């Protein structure tokens, strides 16, 4: 009936920690690039493979949408990496809960993250014409978390008449 704690599972833990680490790395790269325009990140392999260019683009904040809808000063106009950190933390915490609502929230948040990943992948390839190793890896992590979320849907017992 109620919600109880459980282990999130090794795979969910690994995916969430990897996603969190990549999101924190993206924040670091963006901050370093803001301080020094000549900063070259480890993920900057060439002119068409540059994560720092992607993170510093207008689509690197609020998915490129928040500023135009809510304004540049909106609290939601944050680096996409901030949303990533929040998402991976929520996924890990919800993965520790056993209950119907936790499962529903896991699935819904996973679907939103995959939709966001598809949108950002489209921007990455067809607008920025770039290849971001960190971005592609987070998209794969999001897809993996979505698959895990669908596997973890609890079977509810049906009362026999």
Curated annotation (Swiss-Prot):
Disulfide bonds: 43-51, 132-135
Leading EC class: oxidoreductase
Tissue: Highly expressed in liver. Detected at lower levels in lung, kidney and testis.
Parts of the chain on the Lumenal side: 30-80, 129-131
Keyword field: Disulfide bond, Endoplasmic reticulum, Membrane, Oxidoreductase, Quinone, Redox-active center, Transmembrane, Transmembrane helix
Subcellular location: Endoplasmic reticulum membrane
Positions annotated to bind phylloquinone: 135, 139
Transmembrane regions: 10-29, 81-95, 101-128, 132-153
Residues in compartment: Cytoplasmic: 1-9, 96-100, 154-161
EC number in record: 1.17.4.4
The keyword Lipid biosynthesis is annotated on this UniProt entry: no
Gene Ontology MF terms: quinone binding; vitamin-K-epoxide reductase (warfarin-insensitive) activity; vitamin-K-epoxide reductase (warfarin-sensitive) activity
SMART domains attached to this UniProt entry: VKc
Activity regulation, free text: Inhibited by warfarin (coumadin). Warfarin locks VKORC1 in both redox states into the closed conformation.
Pfam families on file: VKOR (PF07884)
Record-level GO cellular component terms: endoplasmic reticulum lumen; endoplasmic reticulum membrane
Topology versus the membrane: Multi-pass membrane protein
PANTHER family in UniProt: VITAMIN K EPOXIDE REDUCTASE COMPLEX SUBUNIT 1, VITAMIN K EPOXIDE REDUCTASE COMPLEX, SUBUNIT 1
Record-stated family: Belongs to the VKOR family.
Annotated function: Involved in vitamin K metabolism. Catalytic subunit of the vitamin K epoxide reductase (VKOR) complex which reduces inactive vitamin K 2,3-epoxide to active vitamin K. Vitamin K is required for the gamma-carboxylation of various proteins, including clotting factors, and is required for normal blood coagulation, but also for normal bone development.
Protein known as: Vitamin K epoxide reductase complex subunit 1
């Amino acid at each position: 009936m109620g919600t109880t704690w459980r282990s999130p599972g090794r795979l969910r833990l690994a995916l969430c920690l990897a996603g969190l680490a990549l999101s924190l790395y993206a924040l670091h790269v963006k901050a370093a690039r803001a301080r020094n325009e000549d900063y070259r990140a480890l993920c900057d392999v060439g002119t068409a493979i540059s994560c720092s260019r992607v993170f510093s683009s207008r689509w690197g904040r609020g998915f490129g949408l928040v500023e135009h809808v809510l304004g540049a000063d909106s609290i939601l106009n944050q680096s996409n990496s901030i949303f990533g950190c929040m998402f991976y933390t929520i996924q890990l915490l919800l993965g520790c809960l056993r209950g119907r609502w936790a499962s529903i929230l896991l699935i819904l948040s996973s679907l939103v993250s995959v939709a966001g990943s598809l949108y950002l992948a489209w921007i990455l390839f067809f607008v920025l014409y770039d290849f971001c190793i960190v971005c592609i890896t987070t998209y794969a992590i999001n897809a993996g978390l979505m698959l895990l979320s669908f596997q973890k849907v609890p079977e509810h017992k049906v009362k026999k008449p």
